[in-house]
A protein has these predicted regions:
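Start-of-helix register in tetratricopeptide repeats
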Residues: 23, 57-60, 94, 128, ...
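Canonical positions in the second alpha-helix
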Residues: 48, 84-85, 118-119, 193
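Short coil turns that delineate tetratricopeptide repeat
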Residues: 53-56, 90, 124-125, 198
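Canonical tetratricopeptide repeat
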Residues: 60-64, 98, 132-135, 139, ...
Length: 217
């Protein structure tokens, strides 16, 4: 009986020490976060997670871990921790949006679009999902439009300098086909931007320019 009591006391004491250590690590993480030592904060938070496992996850701390990971540009960890806060329904709107931002930083564009569309569906009253996705499509369309404009200028310059014989020169015609492709490919992205943000005059103007150029080529 005494042996059982002794073992119980030892286990209780050991558990108390672990709890104290975990609390100390979490406090150290919070202190580091306050002074913007994000690497140190994340290190301490991860020690807490390693010690506690999956028992009663501290979603506030996990969310802070994701934020710290963004600050030190460890985007894989940031996405992982935002996945956990999404699963725990902790700050769901911010967790979804920030995960999408992390994916965009990683240039995982298809995954970014997927998460943003999920956010639009789940949180229709939150405008930032539509706003950011509209900007993404606007940028995508703008890049293709600018590529087309640059290629067109180059083709015209070569024509003026007699590098191309005339507008029937096969090399000139090949360049014009590339120009047409860039302008044509820009339009679907611009349409999506306009659909998400109908008031965006810039997207409408660029789309109109694409259409005008395609008619003249």
């Amino acid at each position: 009986m005494k042996k059982v009591i002794f073992i119980f006391i030892m286990c209780f004491s050991f558990g108390s020490l672990i709890a104290q250590d975990v609390a100390a690590l979490k406090n150290a993480g919070n202190d580091a976060l306050k002074v913007k030592d994000f690497a140190k904060a994340l290190e301490n938070y991860e020690k807490v997670m390693a010690a506690t496992g999956t028992a009663g996850p501290d979603y506030a701390m996990i969310y802070n871990s994701a934020v710290c990971a963004i600050q030190i540009k460890n985007y894989e960890k940031a996405a992982k921790y935002f996945d956990q806060t999404i699963a725990g329904n902790y700050k769901p709107e911010d967790s979804f949006f920030n995960k999408a931002m992390v994916l965009k930083l990683q240039k995982k564009n298809e995954e970014y679009i997927k998460v943003m569309n999920e956010g639009i569906t789940k949180f229709p009253e939150n405008p930032k999902f539509k706003t950011d996705l509209a900007k993404y499509y606007l940028m995508d369309g703008s890049v293709q439009y600018n590529n087309g404009a640059t290629l067109l200028k180059s083709a015209i310059d070569k024509l003026k300098s007699k590098k191309y014989k005339d507008t029937k020169d096969p090399a000139y015609l090949a360049d014009i086909e590339k120009v047409k492709k860039e302008f044509s490919d820009a339009i679907p992205s611009l349409d999506k931007s306009i659909e998400l943000n109908p008031a965006d005059a810039t997207a409408k103007t660029i789309k109109s320019n694409c259409e005008k150029q395609l008619k003249t080529l």
